[in-house]
Amino acid sequence: MMTRMELRPLEIGFSKALTEVAPVTCQCECWDHNLCSSQASEMDLIYQSQDTHSCASKQDAVFQLLSETKIPVPNRYRKISHRLSTLSNKKTLKSQLDRFLSSSKKLHNDDVNRGDYCFLLSTPVECSASTNSHSYDCLWNFSCNSFPEYSSYSASETSSVASYSYYSGPNPATPSSSSCNLVNANSLDIYLNINNLKKSKSVPRLRGQFMEPVEHNHPLSKSLEEQSSFLEQSKDASSNLTACNRSGSSLSSNFYSSRLSKKTSLASLNKSRASLQHKIMSLSRNIIRRVFHKPEVHLDPSASILNLSSSHGESNLTNGLLCQNFKLFQDDWLMEDCAPDANFTLYTPLQPWEKRSVKPEIRRPRLNPNFFRVFVLEAQMRRAGKLSANTAGRAQLIYLPKPAVTFSTSPLHVEL
């Protein structure tokens, strides 16, 4: 008797049973798909690579995938299993496979391009390029370029991830071909020469070699490198002091060296804190908004710094806010897209609310994913001690209610 957790496989292949169907081998010597049919609920797509890159037609791969494919049906649907159309499932599967195999777009083994039947397909393209004596693994998908002597492969998952281009011939952009060529410092295109690789299995091990220039030129890694160099200098200074202590032994020099080590540790903490603050400001530069009510003073949209005088004669109320864009909305609201200054505590009222000529209003939170993402991030940073409790973040500013309104007269006063 079958338990409730067991899966009842529904065969959607051809009319013959799997044991009676002869294994149809794909004529593509490069991509040999073998579907493991030992278990009904598991399908393992095994790629076996050969030395050549001659690939067969699409119908062979579709025929093999359809002939040895089972779709598991839950046991609780056993009463209506006869209502499930095997033919419709087979047609749907075949149409999806045909669409995957006939599409010109390069499909990668990721969750974005995965079909409804959990097939991770990456089809090779027929290529008649002249291959060298090296044996290439079919883990990489080679496609023919406009030049017959080059075969390139580019994989770009997102815009923020570097795209890698592999070529089997000399790079026309550079006179001398090397194992790793960073073509442009502004772009993230990296070329790796396949001829220098002895075995294709060593390609994942070489990731650190051609990722090193990208990580080195990344703006977020420069602060970490400066911090590491500063720590090395502090270690050298402390080692020099200990050598002096050994030559001229004195109690005061040991005391000063311990004081210096404490100072260097504190300086490293300050350095890391400054780098973290720089990262936070660079990441939150696009979400910083400050909303003002339109004052009586005429504002010049071309001005770079907004300077207003308060009732006490103080100037530059928006100190530390370098405003580049002024946007005038309806109902006389003025919003600035600003970049904060490191030496200015943002949204800290220096005067009472009623004495400010420009009153910043705190709006209600927008029910969008960006607000909740920033709110959760700031909560986690406060919990981890990365963000001080005295500084008000962007999400906390929007989340907190408006300040209390001070009436000149009692609100309960009724005029007759």
Swiss-Prot record:
InterPro entries for the chain: PB1A10.08
UniProt KW keywords: Cytoplasm
Localization terms from the record: Cytoplasm
Recorded GO CC terms: cell division site; cytosol
Domain of life: Eukaryota
Residues making up the signal peptide according to the UniProt record: none
Physiological role: May have a role in meiosis and sporulation.
The protein, known as: Meiotically up-regulated protein PB1A10.08
Species whose genome carries this gene: Schizosaccharomyces pombe (strain 972 / ATCC 24843)
